[in-house]
Amino acid sequence: MKKSLIALAVLASTGAMAQSSVTLYGIVDVALQTSKVTNSPRQNTMESGGVNGSRFGLKGSEDLGGGLKALFVLENGFKADTGAIGGGAGLNGITNTKPATAMFGRKAYVGLAGGFGEFRLGNVPTAYDDTAINANSIFDSNYAPAYSVWAGGHNYNGTPGNSVYYASPSFGGVTLAASYALGENKTTTMNAKGLGAINVQYAGGPIYASLAYQEDKTSAPGVGTVATNAYKDTLANFSYDLGVVKLLTSYNRQVATDNTKSDQFQLGADVPVGAALTLSGGYAYSKDKLNGSTTEKRQGFGLGAKYALSKRTFVYTAATFAEQKPTGGTKVKGDVYAVGVQHSF
C-alpha cells in the first residue's frame, strides 16, 4: 500500500479549497544469479533489479480547480545489492544518458493535466518507451529474451532528459502521445540534435495494441554535417488475454544512417496458475544487415515464474538462453539462471 506523506487543504486565492498530496513509493528487487558465456568462466552474482529496477520516488499533485491539476514525479534508481545510486539503474534493455550519480536519473518532471490530456517537462521517458514494456514476456524483466537478443543492435535511449511530453485523453480506448528531447550543447565539433518519439495505443477488453516510432539524433559530429549515428526505431506490440493465457508479440525495426538495419521479433505467453502463481515464456529473434547483407543473427528463449506472497511482495525465478552468430564468424552462446524477491511500497 502506497503511503501518503502529506495531504492538506490550502485556501486558493479564489477562496476555493485546493487539495495537495505527496506520496513516497518504491521497489526493492534483488536476485541471486549465475551466468555463463562461451569461452568465459561462469559468474555467480547478486543483481539489483531482476524483474524491475530498484527505485524510490516522490510523486504529487495539486488540484488547481476547473478540472486542472499540477503534478510532479522525482524517481531515483539505485543498486539494492550495493546501496549505490544508479542514476537510471534498472531501466531494462535501454540506454540511459544520465551519469551514474544522477539523483533522479529515472524520472524528474513537472506537468499539468486536465481534460486536454497531460503535459510534462523534464527528465521524462519517451513516447516510444511508453509502449516498449507492454507485450514483453517474463514480466518485462531483465530475463526476457528480447532484452539480450534485441540488445545486440542498438539500445534505444528511453530517458534522454530535457524533454517535452504530451499524452492525450482516451478516445474509446485509443490514446496518442508525443515527446521531444532538445538537442542541447551545440559546439563546433558536436552537431547536437534532438530525439523525437510518438505512439498510438489501444486498450480495450482483452486486447492491447500499439505502434510507436522514435528518431534519435542526439549525437552527431560536426555542425551542419549529416548525423552518423542517428537511429530510427519502429515498434509494434500486440497482446490478447484469453483468461487462461495471455498471448504477447512485438516487432521492431531499427534503421541507422550508416546503412545498418536490424529486424527484431519476439513472442511469448503469460499463464496464471491459481491466484498467486504466474508462469511466463518467450522467444526472440533478430537479424542485422549492412548495405543489404546479413551481418549477424541472434535468437534466445526464456522461462520464468513468479509467486505472490502478498499484494506487494513476490518471489521469482527465471532461466534465459541466447546465442549470436556473426556471418562467417563463431557462434557465441550464453545462459542466465536467477532466483529473487521483490517488494514494492
Predicted feature residues:
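Outer-membrane beta-barrel "beta-signal"
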Residues: 171, 303, 307-309, 333-345
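Outer-membrane beta-barrel architecture
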Residues: 13, 57-59, 109-111, 165-167, ...
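Detector for outer-membrane/organellar transmembrane beta-barrel domains
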Residues: 191-302, 307-308, 319
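Transmembrane beta-strands of outer-membrane beta-barrel pores
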Residues: 30-36, 76-80, 125-127, 180-184, ...
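Transmembrane beta-strands of outer-membrane beta-barrel proteins
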Residues: 22-30, 66, 70-74, 119, ...
